[in-house]
Swiss-Prot record:
Gene, per the UniProt record: CDA7
GO MF term (any one): zinc ion binding
Catalytic site positions: E78 (proton donor)
Residue ranges the record marks as coiled coil: none
InterPro entries per record: CMP_dCMP_dom (IPR002125), Cyd/dCyd_deaminase_Zn-bd (IPR013171), Cyt/Deoxycyt_deaminase (IPR050202), Cyt_deam_dimer (IPR006263), Cytidine_deaminase-like (IPR016193)
Protein name in UniProt: Cytidine deaminase 7
Keyword terms of this UniProt record: Hydrolase, Metal-binding, Zinc
Source organism of the structure: Arabidopsis thaliana (Mouse-ear cress)
Function as written in the Swiss-Prot or TrEMBL entry: This enzyme scavenges exogenous and endogenous cytidine and 2'-deoxycytidine for UMP synthesis.
Cofactor, free-text remark: Binds 1 zinc ion per subunit.
Residues reported to bind Zn(2+): H76, C111, C114
Length: 307
């Protein structure tokens, strides 16, 4: 592959085929590339995942660690991959391969945290996971439902028909009653992007949607939104989701190139991201990173119309 594509995280079906991924069982052909993009400065361990979306496009997932922060703020490769699916408006994940050995020979089941995270997707029971020992030439696929028996799922909590992760949603949030006010002359524009992210946020369990927008030193912006898990602890915060976008599209930039950040979260939310977001950005972003927080409200008229 050309040198200019060494930071590529998303492949069309044709591009994937040119890399040897001509069928799902060949997903491991891209695993070394995924591992080369991982950011594991604490563990010194690079973990990669490769997944095929329902569109046929192939995505890479990597582990991301943050020196100076507690380990639970790290991003798992499977979380990275699914978040990037959401950011690219994919409708589902079909097959997934996760390397469990540094030599890229063995592939195994996602950790329990990520199996639970995968349960939030709209086609969770159809997801196939590649299992391959070092003694097998190709391995075989197993379903997520077999790898997570006696599972606790969104169906146990949410009303029937509720939109799940990777399904279209609009949280009907607004910063004020006026679009003109949102985009007035003092608007940083990141505020609008963070609001749009919050409107995509998957937070059906606490109803605390939030979104983050980041800007780097060259003016390029990135965004992500809070993704909840029915099991709570596997949830992914909005800063981490925005950092998935940053890692996937910044072409190798360090987090210290992030110079501006905006968090939009629901007013009086049961789960607030403000303090955690500030802690993360204070630790990894540029020393002078400008961090702003805006509180949004549900537009009841819009919500009534959409329902």
């Amino acid at each position: 592959m050309a040198a200019q594509d060494k930071y590529k995280f998303v492949f069309t079906a044709k591009e994937a085929a040119s890399e040897g991924v001509t069928e799902p069982i060949r997903l491991p052909k891209l695993i070394r590339k995924a591992m080369s993009l991982a950011r594991g400065p604490i563990s010194k361990y690079k973990v990669g995942a490769v997944g095929r979306a329902s569109s046929g496009r192939v995505y890479l997932g990597v582990n991301v660690e943050f020196p100076g922060l507690p380990l639970h703020h790290s991003i798992h490769p499977e979380q990275f991959l699914v978040t990037n699916l959401a950011l690219n408006s994919e409708k589902g994940l079909r097959q997934l391969a996760v390397a469990i050995s540094s030599d890229c020979i063995e592939f195994g089941a996602p950790c329990g945290n990520c199996r639970q995270f995968l349960m939030e997707t709209s086609n969770e029971l159809d997801i196939k996971i590649l299992l391959k020992s070092k003694h097998e030439a190709e391995g075989s696929f197993s379903s997520l439902k077999l790898l997570l028996p006696y599972r606790f799922t969104p169906d146990d909590v949410l009303p029937k028909g509720s939109p799940l992760l990777l399904e279209k949603r609009d949280n009907c949030l607004t910063l004020s009653g006026s679009t003109e006010e949102i985009c007035s002359s003092d608007c940083s524009h990141l505020k609008c992007k963070a609001l749009a992210a919050a409107n995509n946020s998957f937070s059906p369990y606490t109803e605390s949607p939030s979104g983050v927008a980041l800007q780097d030193d060259e003016g390029k912006w990135y965004r992500g939104w809070y993704i909840e898990s029915v099991a709570y602890s596997p949830s992914l915060g909005p800063v981490q989701a925005a950092l998935v976008d940053f890692v996937a599209r910044s072409r190798g930039k360090g987090f210290n190139k992030i110079v501006e950040a905006v968090l939009v979260e629901k007013n009086n939310a049961r789960v607030s991201q403000e303090r955690t977001a500030k802690m993360i950005l204070d630790t990894i972003a540029a020393p002078n990173c400008d961090f702003k927080v805006f509180h949004c409200y549900v537009d009841l008229q819009k919500k009534f119309i959409t329902e």
